[in-house]
């Protein structure tokens, strides 16, 4: 197997093609990684969630990493790493951006069901707070493995 760096264009093409990645955040020197659905746009990634550990971590330490990949087998894959800064789109000045994020994310079937359904199963509160946020990309790189 050979591993090579890929172009910025190839990284962006992967992020436009897939909708699930792994979001890494950290608090008190403890990393935390979770799968997330996302929508890519040049310069940023939009994500929807409910309140929980990842949101609390990112509110205190906004530096995050998103990893996304396409794996055919152990020697044929493409992986992209995005590092950036968390920006919550909850304040009134972000209303247009939040609506834009929602439109992008709505393109994916059932984009909102999983986090809400899971949270509602564990509580009687049907008014679970949802959070739209953006990762402003600081850096992006990718690797491809070929047989």
Regions found by a protein language model. Give the residues of each.
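Short, structured patches in soluble enzyme cores that scaffold and shape functional sites
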Residues: 27, 68-70, 136-139
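Surface loops and adjacent helix of pleckstrin homology
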Residues: 50, 69, 145-147
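Charged, gly/pro-rich active-site loop segments
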Residues: 75-147
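Short, solvent-exposed aromatic-acidic interface loops
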Residues: 50-53, 105
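Short beta-strand segments
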Residues: 18-50, 66-67
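Helix-adjacent hinge/juxtasegments
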Residues: 53-81, 87
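Extreme N-terminal tail/first-helix region
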Residues: 1-17
């Amino acid at each position: 197997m050979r591993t090579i760096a890929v172009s910025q264009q190839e990284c962006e093409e992967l992020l436009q093609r897939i909708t699930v990645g792994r979001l890494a955040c950290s608090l008190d020197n403890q990393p935390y990684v979770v799968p997330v659905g996302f929508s890519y746009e040049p310069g940023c990634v939009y994500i929807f969630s409910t309140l929980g550990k990842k949101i609390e971590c990112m509110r205190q330490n906004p530096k995050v990493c998103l990893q996304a990949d396409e794996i055919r087998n152990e020697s044929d894959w493409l992986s992209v790493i995005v590092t950036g800064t968390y920006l919550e789109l909850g304040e009134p000045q972000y209303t247009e951006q939040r609506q834009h994020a929602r439109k992008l994310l709505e393109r994916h079937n059932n984009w909102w069901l999983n986090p809400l359904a899971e949270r509602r199963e564990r509580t009687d509160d049907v008014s679970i707070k949802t959070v739209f946020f953006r990762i402003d990309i600081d850096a992006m790189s990718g690797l491809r493995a070929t047989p």
